[in-house]
């Protein structure tokens, strides 16, 4: 071959495996492996989900397909028992109201009739007492006074009679003397007439039978006992009938027909939340798979282009380096020729000592580092020693060893940024609208199934309630019509009986009209009010039972479950259709986020390692400073020891 070094074409044959391309390829493989591991993790999640579809469907059917059935059983039992208890309590309340009403009516009748009797008795007894006392006083006065006066007159007239008789005897004698005895009979007749008149006055008296008539009027004052007894007996008849009817009622038979309480059958249609939504689940994972594929293709294209670009750059760099090598060779030959003394036999040994071949090599093969060092040193200082120290520091920091630390640190940080970006993209997809849309569709299907079952059950429950309401209104409150009609008739009869009693007692007297007016004010108006009240009860007595609203019941159930879950621990939460879909979504997202979190932790560790490499690179700066200080101290010490 003639030479032991590599020429340009031989160097270019190895350009594909340069260190920069190798680093790029290693980074590409690392990121591709990272993407592959993420993809495998999500594939495992999808496989696990699909493999457990049967279990998910089983628990879903237990909740959704069976819930309306068991809720219907529970609800029907509660409705039936509540209806029976409501009817029983209603009957008991009605029975109490019947007794209260009867007693109130009896009390009011006693109150009103008692008031009426009191008014009448007070008026009549007072009048009779006054009249009787006045009559007795007059009779006693008349009878006693006339007899006494007659006796006194009779005593007075006896003396007068003697005088008159003596006068009459004298007159009679004179008359007989002159005329004879013709008029003697006239004088005797006049005297006898006087005596007869006084005797008649003695026999004058007021008969005591007038007191008997007043006592009889007082005794005949009406007390309405017959009317009250008759009214109470008439009032008690319908109330007794009602009480007996209420006692004979069986509350369990009064409620509606239990056949209306339909129990939703357990749904065996095979609706499955997981199996029926495999397409949506696959769609979510397909979206994530597309992200992985797109990321893989992007990484491949970018890194392959970068590797090709570095290959081209290194080919150009190799060509430039080959030119510099040839220049270095020519420069070395030129310096050797220029420094060689043709008259000195030892010139071949002295020339290399005047040439710093290592510095020349550095200037040729580290062109950019040396150029940057010269530029930086001239900007910082004009002293030659300081400039050379700065150039040495740049050379130290840009050596292949130091640049290896810098490359590892920067490439590691770059790979971590790429991996973080991939994790962020996948996380956004998982927590994005696609997953939310899938879970919303599943939740809607579950809600529709449960709500339809609740609606069907509420319809059957309302039929049962309708039948119960009809039975109650017909068999319980239907009696009120008969009762109110009977009581109204009794009130009418009571008014007629009172009128008859007043008419019988006072008709044809001056007390009839006042007593009739008093009766109307005291009793008649109240009886008319009772009649009006009974008519109102007759028209309004009915029961209206509330109906079951399936939609409202379902919404309230969901709200109660939500409120209950918000105030209880997670282990005590009650599942509902929304929470099942949410839980499924949360489980999928949680599993995916757990994988992403694990890989994120791995990337964080890689970032820490890369940062350590970068810190080690910057640690070279104080090390270089220490070396410069040591060299300066050594140089100063050597100069002092030099003679």
Curated annotation (Swiss-Prot):
Cell location: Cell membrane
Signal peptide positions (record): none
Glycosylated position list: 133, 143, 195, 229, 250, 277, 293, 447, 466, 482, 488, 507, 549, 560, 565, 576
Record topological domains on the Cytoplasmic side: 43-103, 318-405, 628-643
Any Gene Ontology CC annotation: plasma membrane
Transmembrane segments: 22-42, 104-124, 297-317, 406-426, 607-627
Topology versus the membrane: Multi-pass membrane protein
Family, as annotated: Belongs to the PRM1 family.
Name used for this protein in its record: Plasma membrane fusion protein PRM1
């Amino acid at each position: 071959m003639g030479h032991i070094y590599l020429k340009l074409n031989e160097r270019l044959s190895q350009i594909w495996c340069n260190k920069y391309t190798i680093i790029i390829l290693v980074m590409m493989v690392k990121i591709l492996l990272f993407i592959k591991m993420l993809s495998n993790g999500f594939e495992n999640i999808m496989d696990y989900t699909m493999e457990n579809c049967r279990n998910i469907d089983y628990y879903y059917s237990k909740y959704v397909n069976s819930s309306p059935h068991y809720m219907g059983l529970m609800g029907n039992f509660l409705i039936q028992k509540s209806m029976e208890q409501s009817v029983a309590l209603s009957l008991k309340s009605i029975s109490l109201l019947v007794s209260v009403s009867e007693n109130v009516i009896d009390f009011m009748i006693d109150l009103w009739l008692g008031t009426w009797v009191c008014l009448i008795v007070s008026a009549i007894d007072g009048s009779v007492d006054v009249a009787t006392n006045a009559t007795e006083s007059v009779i006693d006065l008349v009878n006693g006074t006339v007899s006494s006066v007659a006796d006194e007159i009779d005593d007075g007239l006896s003396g007068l009679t003697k005088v008159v008789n003596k006068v009459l005897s004298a007159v009679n004698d004179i008359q007989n003397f002159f005329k004879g005895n013709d008029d003697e009979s006239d004088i005797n007749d006049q005297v006898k007439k006087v005596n007869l008149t006084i005797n008649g006055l003695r026999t004058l008296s007021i008969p005591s039978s007038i007191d008997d008539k007043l006592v009889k009027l007082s005794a005949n004052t009406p007390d309405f006992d017959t009317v009250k007894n008759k009214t109470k007996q008439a009032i008690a008849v319908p109330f007794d009938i009602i009480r007996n009817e209420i006692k004979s009622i069986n509350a369990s038979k009064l409620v509606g027909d239990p056949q209306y309480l339909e129990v939703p059958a357990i749904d065996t249609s095979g609706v499955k939340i997981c199996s029926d939504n495999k397409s949506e689940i696959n769609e979510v994972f397909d979206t994530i798979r597309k992200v992985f594929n797109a990321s893989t293709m992007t990484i491949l294209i970018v890194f392959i282009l970068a590797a090709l670009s570095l290959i081209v750059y290194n080919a150009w760099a190799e060509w430039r380096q080959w030119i510099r090598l040839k220049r270095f060779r020519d420069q070395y030959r030129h310096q050797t020729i220029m420094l060689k003394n043709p008259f000195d036999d030892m010139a071949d040994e002295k020339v290399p000592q005047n040439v710093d071949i290592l510095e020349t090599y550095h200037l040729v093969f580290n062109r950019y580092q040396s150029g940057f060092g010269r530029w930086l040193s001239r900007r910082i200082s004009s002293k030659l020693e300081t400039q050379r120290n700065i150039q040495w520091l740049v050379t130290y920091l840009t050596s292949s060893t130091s640049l290896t630390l810098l490359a590892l640190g920067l490439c590691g940080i770059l790979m971590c940024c790429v991996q973080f970006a991939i994790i962020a993209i996948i996380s956004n997809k998982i927590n994005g609208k696609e997953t939310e849309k899938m879970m919303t569709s599943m939740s809607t299907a579950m809600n529709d199934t449960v709500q339809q079952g609740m609606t069907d059950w509420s319809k059957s429950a309302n039929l049962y309630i309708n039948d119960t309401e009809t039975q109650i209104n017909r068999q319980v409150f239907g009696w009120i019509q008969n009762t109110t009609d009977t009581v109204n008739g009794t009130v009418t009869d009571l008014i007629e009986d009172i009128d008859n009693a007043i008419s019988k007692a006072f008709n044809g007297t001056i007390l009839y009209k006042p007593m009739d007016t008093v009766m109307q004010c005291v009793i008649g108006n109240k009886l008319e009010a009772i009649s009006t009240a009974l008519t109102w009860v007759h028209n309004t007595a009915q029961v209206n039972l509330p109906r079951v609203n399936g939609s409202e019941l379902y919404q309230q159930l969901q709200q109660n479950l939500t409120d209950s879950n918000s105030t209880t621990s997670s282990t005590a939460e009650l599942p509902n259709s929304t929470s099942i879909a949410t839980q499924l979504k949360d489980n999928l997202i949680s599993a995916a986020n757990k994988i992403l979190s694990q890989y994120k932790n791995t990337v964080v560790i890689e970032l820490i390692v890369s940062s350590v490499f970068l810190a080690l690179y910057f640690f070279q700066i104080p090390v270089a400073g220490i070396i410069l200080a040591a060299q300066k101290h050594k140089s100063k010490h050597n100069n002092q020891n030099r003679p």
